[in-house]
Amino acid sequence: MALLLNSTITVAMKQNPLVAVSFPRTTCLGSSFSPPRLLRVSCVATNPSKTSEETDKKKFRPIKEVPNQVTHTITQEKLEIFKSMENWAQENLLSYLKPVEASWQPQDFLPETNDEDRFYEQVKELRDRTKEIPDDYFVVLVGDMITEEALPTYQTTLNTLDGVKDETGGSLTPWAVWVRAWTAEENRHGDLLNKYLYLSGRVDMRHVEKTIQYLIGSGMDSKFENNPYNGFIYTSFQERATFISHGNTAKLATTYGDTTLAKICGTIAADEKRHETAYTRIVEKLFEIDPDGTVQALASMMRKRITMPAHLMHDGRDDDLFDHYAAVAQRIGVYTATDYAGILEFLLRRWEVEKLGMGLSGEGRRAQDYLCTLPQRIRRLEERANDRVKLASKSKPSVSFSWIYGREVEL
């Protein structure tokens, strides 16, 4: 991935010409069009208003092509399962939420604003702590923060799930209450990291803010198919991934001497762990009620691959921004291919997939066999990929990140 990036402009033009450069659509008499050299022929614009309209529409499309998405695949019979689980969710799921009055808030970790002298003193202390932290760490921390800030997309996506979505925006079903309260808890994560990064002075906040706007506007390709089986499997995986990622940024912050930042990342990781436990409990209950349908859904999601929610990340410059951010995260050990396989192994053990027996159809048994051998296959692929990376790393490719004022970071 990194070795193909000979030029940002070249990559941008290859993957999405509209991002790199665009020219008016013309019909040229007697010559082919070869920008940017001026043409010495007469040209007649064809339907310029339509061209402008099409260009405007494309401005708001994701930077990456999103394939045709399948919708509403759950059967009525399986929808009834979620209806029957409402009492269970009321008693078991909502217990993983914390009351607002007992919850931490971003201001608990930030400089005090009610005392001007103390505020400036604490900001200076914060900047002194962060000024020696390397750029690659900030690239990953910014990427993590942007992922958290795209929370509107995640709430919207969860509310596409048939049988559990919030039908009114204020529904009192336990599923709807959970999604709103989970969103409220998650909202603090992006708020806190955003403010801390702003005060550090180490990142270009305008480019960070542009990336957030681009990402929320692009949405995500969840592959849920409006199916709550798929949705809760995905969130189980994703919450564990964010728990690992924030936990590792906490460890690195400690290494770099910023104990406050370490506490921030560790506190966020603890929230993610609690949310992971809640979502894995839902899937555990589904395995109890419908082992055949659940194991098939899990196999289906793994065949499609669990894609991180910020995979459509873009800053208006780098069409491969998410891949570059992920490559840096892999290199410094925040989130790696090893973690991906480890999460799958953890969930397979948690849900005792290998022990499933009675009640599985032929398709269910095939899904079980596929899942139980998948981690080993992923690790073999990972080893081959690592070998290729080692060979390629001799050239030490680097990429410029707008988030850190265009400075280059090794991939």
Curated annotation (Swiss-Prot):
Its EC number is 1.14.19.2. Pfam families: FA_desaturase_2 (PF03405). Disruption phenotype: Reduced omega-7 fatty acids accumulation in the endosperm. The endosperm oil of double mutant aad2-3 aad3-3 lacks omega-7 fatty acids. Its main location: plastid. It comes from the Eukaryota. This is Stearoyl-[acyl-carrier-protein] 9-desaturase 2, chloroplastic. It is found in: Plastid, Chloroplast. Induction: Activated by MYB115 and MYB118 in the endosperm.
